[in-house]
Curated annotation (Swiss-Prot):
Pfam assignment, any one: Ala_racemase_N
GO molecular function list: alanine racemase activity; pyridoxal phosphate binding
Enzyme class, first EC level, given as a word: isomerase
Cofactor: pyridoxal 5'-phosphate
Keywords: Isomerase, Pyridoxal phosphate
InterPro entries on file: Ala_racemase (IPR000821), Ala_racemase/Decarboxylase_C (IPR009006), Ala_racemase_C (IPR011079), Ala_racemase_N (IPR001608), Ala_racemase_pyridoxalP-BS (IPR020622), PLP-binding_barrel (IPR029066)
Positions carrying N6-(pyridoxal phosphate)lysine: 33
GO biological process, one term: D-alanine biosynthetic process
Family to which this protein belongs: Belongs to the alanine racemase family.
Full protein name: Alanine racemase
Binding site for substrate: 118, 283
Reported function: Catalyzes the interconversion of L-alanine and D-alanine. May also act on other amino acids.
């Protein structure tokens, strides 16, 4: 069966490197949404906890429940209020019109729209939002924003930072001891993080976004069959690849049903061991030169992202959660 190997030492190295950058593990919010970006949330949770991480963020209540035994604080980022929220968790308030729909006395972090215009409350509407939060009997314990262009060299990043500083000044008039967080993975290595803020880290904890970090995930497939492909014979759907000489080929147990982008046989898609995929990828398998019982499909998602003209996030989060993940 196909297999995802998670490098424990690389993950721990990355978290230590990040914690050193921001000052401590206590100021770190590890984002574990979407199965920890495809890496396996439940597999990584005890590693993060043992290093001193006590705060994580996830997408949904279901994700929070999966790892609640490991962390003191779990922020749910994409929640639609239903009135029966769990007091064990913290909920993002993304739209002030939804405030009355939350269960009373539930802990919330208020999302501020500082310029991304996706979720959150505009700074000019913040005082009105505070009134609604107080009248709804919600427990405001934090406030945050998300930078839209922290990885791009334009001025919008600094405009958003300034807008968040304005929001902090306003909310501090009404509340004390709030937890603030604005810097994401892209912003982490772009400048100093304000001393009164935590830092949310997503993909950087898995080795992307800074050259000093180490890749954590590698994807492997196992051989289903092998044969001699004779000169002039083709392999796979449509016969896209034809052997120019006799060659030993093998078929491996990984395909687009496992969350991989479908290779259509055009161009050279280089695998983790340097071999290239031969012919079109099938639903549950692909072929290449025989590389033994096990083959590394990729250990750097950037290579596949570049080939398919997408981003490394998409390569990783699409990996089927049913693929076994193991620590190595």
């Amino acid at each position: 069966m196909s297999l995802i190997k998670i490098d424990q030492k690389a993950y721990e190295y990355n978290l230590r490197h990040i914690a050193k950058k921001i000052g401590s593990f206590q100021r770190l919010i590890c984002v574990f949404k979407d199965n920890a970006y495809g890496h396996g949330a439940k597999l990584l949770a005890p590693l993060a906890k043992n290093l001193g991480v006590s705060f994580v963020a996830v997408k949904s209540e279901e994700e929070a429940q999966e790892i609640e035994e490991f962390f003191e604080n779990i922020l749910i980022l994409s929640h639609r209020p239903h009135g029966n929220e769990n007091s064990r968790f913290i909920y993002a308030l993304n739209d002030i019109s939804q405030a009355k729909k939350y269960k009373q006395d539930i802990k919330i972090h208020l999302k501020i729209d500082t310029g991304m215009h996706r979720n959150g409350i505009c700074v000019e509407n913040l005082e009105h939002a505070i009134d609604l939060i107080q009248s709804s009997d919600l427990k405001l314990t934090g406030m945050f924003t998300h930078f839209a262009s922290a990885d791009e060299m334009d001025g919008s990043f600094f405009v958003q930072k300034e807008n968040f500083q304005k929001a902090k000044k306003i909310v501090k008039k009404y509340f004390s001891n709030l937890l603030f967080h604005s810097h994401n993975s892209a912003a982490l290595f772009r400048g100093k993080i304000p001393e009164d803020e935590y830092c949310r880290v997503g993909l950087v904890q898995f080795g992307y976004g800074d050259s000093n970090l180490k890749r954590v995930l590698s994807l492997y497939a196992h051989r289903l069959s092998q044969r001699i492909l004779q000169k002039g014979q083709s392999i796979g759907y449509g016969g896209i690849f034809t052997a120019a000489k006799d060659m030993e080929v093998a078929t491996y147990d990984l395909g687009y049903a496992d969350g991989l982008f479908r290779y259509n046989g055009k161009g050279e898609l280089v695998l983790g061991n340097g071999k290239v995929m031969l012919g079109k990828m099938s639903m549950d398998s692909f072929s290449c030169e025989n590389s033994g019982e096990e083959i590394c499909v990729f250990k750097d998602a950037d290579i596949w992202a570049d080939f398919f003209h997408t981003i490394n996030y998409e390569i990783l989060v699409k990996l089927n959660p049913n693929i076994q993940r193991v620590l190595v």
